[in-house]
Every structure is written in structure tokens, then in C-alpha cells.
Amino acid sequence: VAIDDALIHQFIGRTLPDVMDILDKHYGSHETTEAVYARHKEIRDEMVKTELELKAGAAECIDELLAAGYHVGLATSSRLATAERNLKMVGLFDKFETVTCGEDVVHGKPDPEMYLLACERAGFAPEECAVVEDSRNGCVSGITAGCHVFAVPDIVPLPQDVVDGCEVVLDTLFDLAAAVKAVR
């Protein structure tokens, strides 16, 4: 079964149930969806073993924000087991003070529920929180939640309406800590 990039781009920042719904609608068959997801999971799990790399500037940015007294939490559409495994592999999991994952919410990104829950768990109002995102769905989620959104696009460029809702769009995580501090 073929799957094109445009379809894959719809998955970015989405929870597994949302991805499965998108696939069901696209293929019109839950059996095909299950087969596509099973193959995707095999490929992804193999890639994680051999190709998982930390995004340049991520560790430095987190360390700088922690040193400056910021609370650093994680809000990811991934399942907790996946996020924990991947972040432990790159030495970052223990740096996050709170973790909110896809299975913690009913509605995944672009719905604001994930960021609203992450803010609540951290003990801050959304307008006190900075969200760092690399996808359209994540940015929309953070913007709609009322957070300050800092975008560092990764795979797909952000549409202008999303860019307009962000505090700033950066080319690299190396510039992120300074941008966050400038808003404080």
C-alpha cells in the first residue's frame, strides 16, 4: 500500500487515534489502516535503534532555560513509553519536570487540550507559558491554548496564518532560549 508525503504530513503532531482516523478515512478500510500502521511501526522502531539523533541545540537550550529558572515540561502527541524511551536514549528525559502525552488527552493537537493540560500540570496559566513547536498542528494547539508559541519548523514549512500567531519563527534551537527570555 502506497502512502504519500502529503498524507504523512497530516500526522505530524497528532495522537495515534487521530492518525488512525486519518488513515481510515483515506483508505476506507480499517484492515488496510492496521496493515499500514503495523509496517510504519516496524520501520520507525528500526530507525529509532539506529538513527535517533537529538535536534541540534535542544540540550543546550533546555539547560540554559533550566539554569535561568524556567520550568521545562514536555507536551507530546507520542505515547509516554515512546517519549520516555526516545528521550532517555538522548539523555533528556530527566530534564522535564512534567510530561503530558497523547494518551493523557481526548483531543490531540491541533486541539488546545494537550497544552491546557500541560499548563495545568505545571501550575501555570497558559499566558505564562512558552510552547516550542515544529509543526502546524502543534503551533495551532499552543496558540489556541493561549500560550506564547515559538516555532522551529522541521519537516514542513508553516503556513502564514500560523506564523502570524507565533511569537517568533526560528531557524534553529540555538536561538530559542534568548527568544523565550526576551518575552519574559
Segments from the language model and where they lie:
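Conserved donor sugar-nucleotide recognition element shared by glycan-biosynthetic enzymes
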Residues: L16, L54, D111
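Hydrophobic beta-strand core positions in alpha/beta domains
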Residues: G73-L74, A151
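Structural motif
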Residues: F11, A75-S77, V132
